[in-house]
From Swiss-Prot:
This is Perilipin-2. It comes from Homo sapiens. Its main location: membrane. One of its GO terms (biological process) is lipid storage. Milk lipid globules.
Length: 437
């Protein structure tokens, strides 16, 4: 004998929500909410941010509570069965629950209109009596509808309160509390207090009164605001740091290029000028060696060594500049495309400057035209840095405020990997130059 499949018992919450009276009322409220959002753009952006926050915390809560719900599934099924039986009896006593709100109002209006027409056609001389009859019918109809709605609200409210008061919901609430607390701790750990928040904390006076713990919604809103603000400040500080490093490298490259030009222009004019150029280049070499951790001041002071060392400085600085440009690009994801194109073009120009010095063994192999174009590219890079920084200071990228903070994580990670590889090659170049000289 073939077994008969038994449909699973529907959830009481699902049945209550699917009642025509409840669902139609919800549709009316939803349409009013959407209409209000469309009419007021500023209110729409705030509502969308709140919806995203609620979706996030709901997802975290459901993930945390899922193991608990699975353990209590038999008890939940029994409670759901009793609740469904009670809802069946309520639906039998109140057929109005299975009618949408628009139909209830239309039926009431139809009954009133029919009564009015019948009285008007049969009793033309008793207007006052007809009016009082119509008023009584309307009051009774309105009272019946109101009473049905109140009973429905009472049933739904009682069912919700019963569910919320159950041990299962208490465990779910505890899971939400733990998830929210852990999220707050993670924000404090990975996104430290900003200077403004530190000043506010310093101005607070510690008291002995107990502070009431805020609700979930207040804590969720505070956490969202705190996360956006601190993430923006951290991203901005990274960009400022990249700009500062780039400007320092550009300044050092300017000085190195000027020294090379000076040596090239005066190498055949007079021995004294040659000696002056060599002295300046040697001092630049010593200063750069000290900046990277070496203090070998007893090295040879001959012209050939000075030239090779100066070219090594130029190669190292251009590699640093390329790395810094990749770091800057990885930290400005989400800004307009023209700003990202400027940052990418800076990396291209840094690569062009590096190609000028990469294979040069002496100053003779670096032409005046290449030095002139390198100086022009360095000046353009400095201007592009100023433009990017001015934009970020005066125009906060929207995704830095409402998330995600790194919408192109793959590109960002690739840029950082390229920067790390260039750092490694730069260090190897430094070691090889040190061993050679």
């Amino acid at each position: 004998m073939a077994s008969v499949a038994v449909d699973p018992q529907p959830s009481v919450v699902t049945r209550v929500v699917n009642l025509p009276l409840v669902s139609s009322t919800y549709d009316l409220m939803s349409s009013a909410y959407l209409s209000t959002k469309d009419q007021y753009p500023y209110l729409k952006s705030v509502c969308e941010m709140a919806e995203n926050g609620v979706k996030t915390i709901t997802s975290v809560a459901m993930t945390s509570a899922l193991p608990i719900i699975q353990k209590l599934e038999p008890q939940i099924a029994v409670a759901n069965t009793y609740a469904c039986k009670g809802l069946d009896r309520i639906e039998e006593r109140l057929p109005i629950l299975n009618q949408p709100s628009t139909q209830i109002v239309a039926n009431a209006k139809g009954a009133v209109t029919g009564a009015k027409d019948a009285v008007t056609t049969t009793v033309t001389g008793a207007k006052d009596s007809v009016a009082s009859t119509i008023t009584g019918v309307m009051d009774k109809t309105k009272g019946a509808v109101t009473g049905s709605v109140e009973k429905t609200k009472s049933v739904v409210s009682g069912s919700i309160n019963t569910v919320l008061g159950s041990r299962m919901m208490q465990l779910v609430s505890s899971g939400v509390e733990n998830a929210l607390t852990k999220s707050e701790l993670l924000v404090e750990q990975y996104l430290p207090l900003t200077e403004e928040e530190l000043e506010k904390e310093a101005k607070k006076v510690e008291g002995f009164d107990l502070v009431q713990k805020p609700s979930y919604y207040v804590r969720l809103g505070s956490l969202s605001t705190k996360l956006h603000s601190r993430a923006y400040q951290q991203a901005l500080s990274r960009v400022k740091e990249a700009k500062q490093k780039s400007q320092q490298t550009i300044s050092q490259l300017h000085s190195t290029v000027h020294l090379i030009e000076f040596a090239r222009k005066n190498v055949y004019s007079a021995n004294q000028k040659i000696q002056d150029a060599q002295d300046k280049l040697y001092l630049s070499w010593v200063e750069w060696k000290r900046s990277i951790g070496y203090d070998d001041t007893d090295e040879s002071h001959c012209a050939e060594h000075i030239e090779s060392r100066t070219l090594a400085i130029a190669r190292n600085l251009t590699q640093q500049l390329q790395t810094t440009c990749h770091t800057l690009l990885s930290n400005i994801q989400g800004v307009p495309q023209n700003i990202q194109d400027q940052a990418k073009h800076m990396g291209v120009m840094a690569g062009d400057i590096y190609s000028v010095f990469r294979n040069a063994a002496s100053f003779k192999e670096v032409s005046d035209s290449l030095l002139t174009s390198s100086k022009g590219q360095l000046q353009k890079m400095k201007e592009s840095l100023d433009d990017v920084m001015d934009y970020l200071v005066n125009n906060t990228p929207l995704n830095w405020l409402v998330g995600p903070f790194y919408p192109q994580l793959t590109e960002s990670q690739n840029a950082q990997d390229q920067g790390a590889e260039m750092d490694k090659s730069s260090q190897e170049t430094q070691r090889s130059e040190h061993k050679t000289h």
